[in-house]
């Protein structure tokens, strides 16, 4: 799913007050963490994930893996925080055209 710039801006505004729902620890990306992200996306549609790593390359690889495995859209990455969006069947968030 590709998001337009206008849609990404809308989602960034909605995500601003949110707290990270999933925190990645020193173990990195595990099956349990992926399951937690899946469950959070199913429940909320728009979530923040906190990635605890200092290395940019590692963080980029983790972000790409999360997006690939969950099928979610990468809305934004700021510092160690990733914002993900994946619509559910009943669409809780309406996107602008």
UniProtKB/Swiss-Prot annotation:
InterPro entries: RNA-binding_CRM, RNA-binding_domain, RNA-binding_YhbY, YhbY-like_sf. It is found in: Cytoplasm. Keywords: Cytoplasm, RNA-binding. Residues 1-97 form the CRM domain. One of its GO terms (molecular function) is RNA binding. One of its GO terms (cellular component) is cytosol. It comes from the Bacteria. GO terms for biological process: ribosomal large subunit assembly; ribosomal small subunit assembly; rRNA 5'-end processing. Pfam families: CRS1_YhbY. Transmembrane segments: none annotated. This is RNA-binding protein YhbY.
């Amino acid at each position: 799913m590709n998001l337009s710039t206008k849609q990404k801006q809308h989602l960034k505004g909605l995500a601003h007050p949110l707290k990270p729902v999933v925190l990645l620890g020193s173990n990195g990306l595990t099956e349990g963490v992926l399951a937690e992200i899946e469950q959070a996306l199913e429940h909320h549609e728009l979530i923040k994930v906190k990635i605890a790593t200092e290395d940019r390359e590692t963080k980029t690889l983790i972000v790409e893996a999360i997006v690939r495995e969950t099928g979610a859209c990468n809305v934004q990455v700021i510092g160690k925080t990733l914002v993900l969006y994946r619509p559910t069947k009943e669409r809780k968030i309406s996107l602008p055209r």
